[in-house]
Amino acid sequence: MQVYMMNKPKGYLTARSDRNRPTVMELLPQELQALHPVGRLDMDTEGLLLLTDDGMLDRRLLRPEHHVEKLYFFRAFGRLEQEAFDRMARGVLLEGTEVLSRPARAWLSGYSTIGDCEALLPPKKHNHLMKNPHRPVTEGYLALCEGRKHQVKLMVKAVGGHVFALKRLSIGALRLDEALKPGEFRPLTAAELELISE
């Protein structure tokens, strides 16, 4: 079994191939093309992504009943108070569904402004957003055991925020190696493999 950790950069699709958009597989050399991503991160999301040739790993890490927590750090437009984080922790109705998110861990990290986050702003909206550089930004964490499409973004939206920067930091006890620059990858160590095999 091969398992690699990648610090997925923004701008890459988590897929084996796509006709029109770059994928994470394009960041890997030919000898690692037999690997596949474990789960997916949105194109504009960065952070911990696992790649493996073990089909059972997906099931073990991704199915909600296995309770493997994924930790995300987000920045969102707007000022979300503690009550919003309490609501996300209890579960919120996800837009476009009749589904209540499962209970999660959610906590506030702090506040900044659009001006403080200029380098992280979506390029197409940069100039428009910088017209109001003092607009508040909320920084927070969400730890989820389920992984619905756009879940973090939808949960934050349900409490009045709009995520513009999102990074996955960990899967279970396995944390992203912060020494990896965006787009870099490495094989898991024996100790790290144990963390995802338990």
Locations of the language-model features?
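Basic, flexible Lys/Arg- and Gly-enriched helix-loop patches that mediate nucleic-acid binding at interfaces
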Residues: M1-E198
